[in-house]
Amino acid sequence: MSILTRIFGSRNERVLRKLKKQVVKINKMEPAFEALSDDELKAKTQEFRDRLSGGETLQQILPEAFATVREASKRVLGMRHFDVQLIGGMVLTNRCIAEMRTGEGKTLTATLPCYLIALEGKGVHVVTVNDYLARRDAETNRPLFEFLGMSVGVNIPGLSPEEKRAAYAADITYATNSELGFDYLRDNLAHSKEERFQRTLGYALVDEVDSILIDEARTPLIISGQAENSSELYIAVNKLIPSLIKQEKEDTEEYQGEGDFTLDLKSKQAHLTERGQEKVEDWLITQGLMPEGDSLYSPSRIVLLHHVMAALRAHTLFEKDVDYIVKDGEIVIVDEHTGRTMAGRRWSDGLHQAIEAKEGVDVKSENQTVASISYQNYFRLYERLAGMTGTADTEAFEFQQIYGLETVVIPTNRPMIRDDRTDVMFENEQYKFNAIIEDIKDCVERQQPVLVGTISVEKSEELSKALDKAGIKHNVLNAKFHQQEAEIVAEAGFPSAVTIATNMAGRGTDIILGGNWKAQAAKLENPTQEQIEALKAEWEKNHEIVMKAGGLHIIGTERHESRRIDNQLRGRSGRQGDPGSSRFYLSLEDGLMRIYLNEGKLNLMRKAFTVAGEAMESKMLAKVIASAQAKVEAFHFDGRKNLLEYDDVANDQRHAIYEQRNHLLDNDDISETINAIRHDVFNGVIDQYIPPQSLEEQWDIKGLEERLSQEFGMELPISNWLEEDNNLHEESLCERIVEIAEKEYKEKEALVGEDAMRHFEKGVMLQTLDELWKEHLASMDYLRQGIHLRGYAQKDPKQEYKKESFRMFTEMLDSLKHQVITTLTRVRVRTQEEMEEAERARQEMAARINQNNLPVDENSQTTQNSETEDYSDRRIGRNEPCPCGSGKKYKHCHGSRVARQ
């Protein structure tokens, strides 16, 4: 600690000192607010809104608003906000993260900033990690907010459009992070203003902010449509992978390996060796999937390479019951941070299909991205962002760097007395499991409840089998049993209860020492007062037993890659000043040790074990683990930052497209825009055939006439114009062509009416924009996947990505203009008379077909011989619509046949 810190305190201490002065103000107001009637207290909401309209700021009314919420909470919920919760609420009104320990009442704390900021009328979004927590928190706080005249909405999957709009229209909306992100994307795929759900993104309060903004940061939200089906190719390539042999190290000048592929466990990537490439190519040729003499890395075989690499990763880097589970014939992803299943989510780049083929379930079609955004960029759209969690301080630097959020550690209401014991290391996993079981036995005998944290479904099941063998009764909470989550967590605090939980499954629900009597009462149908009193008495007895036994004991079966996840596990114990203890059991076979410690350190540690099954505790061990975790955290931070830098490029483009799209939706008349881009398009076309500042000999008039005819359906005698007028230069020529195009367009508009044409313009523009944006996203995906190869040419991949994506984006915008004008210029408008005439012609032709039994042309649905004879006698203009009703011009339809005859 520096001398300045000793004198002035840390930044966190200085912030807390300042906020405590506000707490004193709020506490002084309490007697006055207690004296208010319910109606007077309710009237405060309108008073605050009026004061804000009159020019006061949120900070000026904060003390009174917080005093109002505290008093209303006492009357409605029977809960009074502690001083530390008031501090937490003040932190959350700014762009800050409040780190509040488990059990300190984050749900109640959130009511303070939500009420205050909702007074502005812009809407408040309270973001949770799952549907259960969104519903639970909304229902818990709804009576309080409604008492104060605030409406509450819940936005979860499965709502109807009307329910969703009502949820977003509420003053305070509880929602999951994924649903908010997807609704944003859906709004930007809407075809009318009425289809949109979200209003201005004003204030988001993110619960478990570390889980959403850090753990989920690398997960993009994608709305997709089906691409072409290549499931058979995945099934075929799947048969190849088991024959490939792993090579421990990559080939170098000194080392030439014997294997077919190498693995990078840190980044979860697989690479074929030269030998592996030859083996794969031989197999593909044998199977008839690739012609002889071709290479897997040739541009024409890029799809095959994509399938091979996806299958290789599926077999070597993704484990069943660790990364995913198979449920009801489907592959369901398991969240590596929470241990929860993520139904509905699929891995991209063909990985999900490759795993489906590996597990022998139905292989679904690949998807094409229609719209996407990362959580990082979605939450940065909010005017105000704040978050709460029990563990943020370890990631404070990242929150500041990426989101501009300062982390403030809120003191606990009561001192924390949990006993965090030194880690214990064993030589192998079996010795470690033996020690864990002995620790659990000791706790069960003393009637102390135990929560055992594992890092995967597989490990939780291994430990469960070992406990069954030892005759220890226990509950398992992992991705396979998540439906019973609330029930298992409610029982985890009973005396002698043993609960195995994958990572942080059950996070968001407190483990109450002695069990949860309210959860037991909820199981009873219409419980009597006597039954409730009996449950309370039973709980008090159990609570006393558990307190004497030392509170909840936490056992970690191995260290996670992140210190934050370890702290979350420990944080389940010692809530609100309760006793508790924690200990991590480790082995040299743990993933963290194998992947992130070099062989030299591992060998040194192996030599330290001289007796089989002995445990090792030392300060050096703690340093080694801290060093490994710091490396991993830095690696993942760099990965997230790198991803954001790439996504920022796409984000700028996304912002521009969505802004343009919203402008289209909000305006019923875009004729000025159409006129402007018509000029641009014709100028661009003419410049290709008549270059600016060029000599007349360089002009390609014939080419220009053909282009205007083919693309825009305009038959213009430009050669004649030039012969008739020697002074006609490129600018005046362009003006004349645009004038004619506008004149023809106005004639069409006169036929259908102004409103119909405006509606049509808007529809064409939206449809073309959506189609081109979808194609652009696919191109960006391909560019992103291969851009790292530019590094071999001594070029910076990020800079190259920026340049290439900008070029692609400008090309897309040019294509948008061109396609819109082409469509609008070529569109045919039929008058009522033409439609009636075409119908008569069809009926006549049908009668002749019936009489003569002549063959029918599939395209025009009319006979060839009779129609040419029929129409040759009539005087029809070459550019008029063919009366047969085919939709083509007469010269391109039956007129051409007349000419041939």
Swiss-Prot record:
Region (Disordered): 848-901
Enzyme class name: translocase
Co-factor requirement: Zn(2+)
EC number: 7.4.2.8
Annotated Zn(2+) binding sites: C882, C884, C893, H894
GO cellular component, one term: plasma membrane
Record carries keyword Secreted: no
Cofactor: how bound: May bind 1 zinc ion per subunit.
Biased composition (Polar residues): 849-866
GO molecular function: ATP binding; metal ion binding; protein-exporting ATPase activity
Family indicated by similarity: Belongs to the SecA family.
Database matches in HAMAP family: SecA (MF_01382)
Quaternary assembly: Monomer and homodimer. Part of the essential Sec protein translocation apparatus which comprises SecA, SecYEG and auxiliary proteins SecDF-YajC and YidC.
Name of the featured protein: Protein translocase subunit SecA
Species this chain originates from: Haemophilus influenzae (strain 86-028NP)
